[in-house]
Amino acid sequence: MGTPGEGLGRCSHALIRGVPESLASGEGAGAGLPALDLAKAQREHGVLGGKLRQRLGLQLLELPPEESLPLGPLLGDTAVIQGDTALITRPWSPARRPEVDGVRKALQDLGLRIVEIGDENATLDGTDVLFTGREFFVGLSKWTNHRGAEIVADTFRDFAVSTVPVSGPSHLRGLCGMGGPRTVVAGSSDAAQKAVRAMAVLTDHPYASLTLPDDAAADCLFLRPGLPGVPPFLLHRGGGDLPNSQEALQKLSDVTLVPVSCSELEKAGAGLSSLCLVLSTRPHS
């Protein structure tokens, strides 16, 4: 038996999908959201891929952009991955459901065990699922329903799975994330704090908590690529995006902070953790 939570963030590969021109128009722009600068969004996406590959040392796989899938870059919504198992989700928006096809094929090619959702009554967006290393929390939100959460529990039977009500338009991971194996980070909004309080009641494990001024700053990724002698990384929104949260993030002293920007991609509804899928194809020690 290893240390509880030690499986959190283990990764060798990252999967991303290129930004299509259609992201700047139609559904990709999002109703009522500001106009999106396509070139800037593509630059942000390119920098993210570079950080994953060069800074974190991950093997990067990039699916090509597809104009018929304007929100295709938000592939974090298309799968829930733990160990060698990938649960292919059923996004709330019917227009987004074809996004899972290319992701499924890529994960199959990497040797993961694929689990499908066959229940047409289920909805599940991957960014409503938070894995702590010990257990899963699934946000019951506009995007994910109780049947979707039940399928997460059926798929990952080795872990406790609890449901957390999420109010407003957010996904659970848009409100809180893991700053380390024992630390939950959360935004300061009422919705974020309500979610964290619910998690504290539901869990049997003691987590430290860190409140950040910005909800979007809590949408981060704790990653352990397993590089010799290198501490874990925290991929997070940088000072150019969220300056008010940087001082609080410095309190996470056990990680190497790796800032990235996705302020333009955010206009299409992207949070940081929605822009990539990370997985490990190495045996877990």
Curated annotation (Swiss-Prot):
Q: Which organism does this record belong to? A: Homo sapiens
Q: In which tissues is it expressed?
A: Detected in heart, placenta, lung, liver, skeletal muscle, kidney and pancreas, and at very low levels in brain.
The UniProt entry's GO CC annotations, sorted and at most eight, read:
extracellular exosome; mitochondrion
Active site annotation, chain numbering? 171, 276
PTM remark: Phosphorylated by TBK1. Phosphorylation inhibits the translocation into the mitochondrion upon Sendai viral infection.
- Result of altering residue 162 to D: No effect on inhibition of MAVS-mediated innate response activation
What broad class of enzyme is this?
hydrolase
- What GO MF terms are annotated? hydrolase activity
Q: Is Mitochondrion one of the keywords UniProt gives this record? A: yes
- Record key words, sorted: Cytoplasm, Hydrolase, Mitochondrion
**Gene3D superfamilies xrefs:** L-arginine/glycine Amidinotransferase, Chain A
| Function comment | Putative hydrolase with unknown substrate. Does not hydrolyze N(G),N(G)-dimethyl-L-arginine (ADMA) which acts as an inhibitor of NOS. In endothelial cells, induces expression of vascular endothelial growth factor (VEGF) via phosphorylation of the transcription factor SP1 by PKA in a process that is independent of NO and NO synthase. Similarly, enhances pancreatic insulin secretion through SP1-mediated transcriptional up-regulation of secretagogin/SCGN, an insulin vesicle docking protein.
Question: Can you tell me which family this protein belongs to?
Answer: Belongs to the DDAH family.
Q: Can you name this protein?
A: Putative hydrolase DDAH2
Record-level GO BP terms: negative regulation of apoptotic process; positive regulation of nitric oxide biosynthetic process
Could you say what the effect of mutating residue 211 to D is? Loss of mitochondrial translocation upon viral infection. Loss of inhibition of MAVS-mediated innate response activation
Where does it localize? Cytoplasm; Mitochondrion
Transmembrane portions of the chain: none
